[in-house]
């Protein structure tokens, strides 16, 4: 069956295309067929670029026949979150405010993917303007392929759902406080927030200039590494872009993790955990130990303050960016999104400065923790996804339940505040019906995505969580 191509990894598809066992046109059509069949149920795509994709696929096949093979992404379909500008193709930002915007420029990321020979098949749904977790989009909620009554998190909700359902093999998400990693966690896929500055933000609609990141989302760690390889690197068009040399992310994947030290925080990251999450997390640490890693305790004293500080910084900067739109078209925003942005406009400058000072403290603490280990492992989400119809779904990605005290939707904001890379990958499923994905999150040192990818790949070689298929077919 042609659609079975959609369940192969990017590495496998790339080799089939390179050796001309299948054509880029065949692969593209397999994914477009699934999009047409399943997207009406999931609502992951906002725009489907059928004609564009077929034309690009034919061109890729012609180049490959002529011996002009561009690399492992040549002929591979992808669909980015609809915050990335695509020249001549609508970029809605998930909002009625900009639903008719057709950019006259290209984001650096999509430009680099075009140069690598990847094929754009559409643009993916998201929380309006990437404003956080939940289900609020100007184009309707994205449903979770593992259970349509549950959220797909946010704000890169379409990306997580589309990869899980194999509507696309690759996506680009954005992440200000967990918006790549949350959707990856609840969809059973892989999401990487790179080091701040590693991937260009030119042509990406901002939410928070000092916290925004863009990065790969995929079905496997190896696929994420292939995608990162294509998009990483300095960009003079982005003032936040870093100049560090981009290493080979793919070659070291098979080196194993013998001798690596994995830090496990002694507090703040596991409070209020659902029992199934705790069990999966402990089993994940056991697998890493079996593979040769050493588990060591670490402490990040003020980690519990990361989410409130991150929210204050992010929404203050977002309110500044959207100030004119709010003044001119307030009725086009979702009411809850508008409320958050308008409220943030009244935050005190002194509070913003305090949050930035806390950010400096967290950076020192995270760097000190990573001085004693190679990476840190925490649960991606302490609890399970929220139901779409639940009261908390519009404000948070997960069921609040009996979680104590000030509830943290995830353990993600600290990586945005400090700029360290963070990788999320599946590590189990809940015991209820339907079984829902559970994920682990790995933090690394600045510009050391390679170690995170290496550990994640080793874990996936030893487990099969990433091979499970959601019940959408």
Q: Where on the chain are the PLM-derived regions?
A:
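Acyltransferase
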Residues: 21-29, 58, 248, 275-299, ...
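Conserved acidic residues
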Residues: 43, 169, 374
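Long amphipathic alpha-helix in the N-terminal Rossmann-like dinucleotide-binding domain
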Residues: 51-61, 117-118
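Short glycine/serine-rich loop/turn segments
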Residues: 73-214, 239, 265-267, 315, ...
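Short helix-loop capping/hinge segments that flank enzyme active sites or metal/cofactor-binding pockets
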Residues: 73-93, 251-266, 313-367, 379-383, ...
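An N-terminal boundary/leader segment
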Residues: 1-54, 290-292, 468-473
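Structural helix-boundary/capping segments
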Residues: 37, 111, 115, 164-271, ...
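Short, well-ordered beta-strand elements within core beta-sheets of diverse protein domains
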Residues: 12-19, 97-101, 212-219, 342-347, ...
């Amino acid at each position: 069956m042609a659609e079975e191509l959609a369940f192969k990894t990017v590495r496998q598809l790339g080799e089939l295309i390179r050796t001309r066992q299948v054509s880029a046109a065949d692969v593209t059509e397999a994914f477009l067929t699934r999009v047409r069949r399943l997207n009406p149920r999931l609502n992951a795509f906002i725009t489907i670029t059928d004609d564009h994709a077929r034309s690009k696929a034919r061109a890729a096949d012609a180049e490959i026949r002529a011996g002009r093979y561009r690399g492992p992404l040549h002929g591979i379909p992808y669909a980015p979150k609809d915050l990335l500008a695509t020249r001549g193709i609508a970029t809605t930002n998930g909002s009625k405010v900009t639903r008719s915007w057709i950019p006259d420029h290209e984001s650096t990321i999509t430009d680099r993917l075009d140069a690598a020979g990847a094929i754009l098949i559409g643009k993916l749904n998201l929380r309006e303007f990437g404003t956080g977790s939940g289900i609020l989009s100007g184009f309707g909620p994205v449903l979770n392929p593992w259970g349509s009554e549950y959220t797909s998190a946010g704000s890169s909700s379409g990306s997580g759902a589309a990869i899980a359902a194999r509507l696309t093999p690759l996506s680009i998400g954005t992440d200000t406080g967990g918006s790549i990693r949350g959707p990856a966690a609840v969809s059973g896929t892989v999401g990487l927030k790179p080091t701040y500055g590693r991937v260009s933000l030119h042509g990406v609609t901002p939410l928070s200039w000092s916290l925004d990141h863009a990065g790969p989302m995929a079905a496997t760690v190896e696929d994420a590494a292939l995608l990162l390889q294509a998009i990483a690197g300095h960009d003079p068009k982005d003032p936040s872009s870093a100049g560090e040399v981009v290493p080979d992310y793919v070659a070291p994947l098979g080196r194993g993790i013998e001798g690596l030290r994995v830090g496990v925080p002694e507090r703040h990251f596991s409070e209020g955990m659902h029992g199934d999450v705790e069990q999966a997390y402990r089993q994940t640490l056991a697998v890493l130990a079996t593979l040769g890693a050493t588990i060591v305790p670490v402490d990040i004293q003020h980690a519990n303050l990361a989410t409130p500080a991150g929210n204050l910084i992010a929404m203050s900067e977002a309110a500044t960016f959207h100030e004119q739109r709010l003044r001119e078209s307030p009725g086009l925003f979702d009411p809850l999104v508008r409320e958050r942005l308008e409220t943030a406009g009244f935050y005190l400058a002194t509070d913003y400065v305090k949050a930035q000072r806390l950010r400096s403290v967290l950076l020192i603490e995270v760097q000190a923790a990573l001085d004693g280990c190679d990476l840190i492992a925490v649960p991606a989400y302490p609890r399970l996804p929220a139901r779409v119809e639940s009261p908390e779904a519009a404000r948070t990605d997960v069921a609040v339940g009996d979680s104590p005290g000030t509830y943290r939707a995830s353990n993600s904001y600290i990586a945005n505040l400090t700029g360290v890379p963070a990788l999320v990958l599946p590590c189990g499923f809940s015991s209820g019906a339907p079984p829902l994905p559970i994920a682990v999150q790995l933090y690394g040192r600045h510009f050391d995505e390679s170690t995170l990818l290496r550990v994640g790949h080793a874990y996936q070689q030893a487990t099969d969580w990433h091979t499970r298929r959601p019940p959408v077919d």
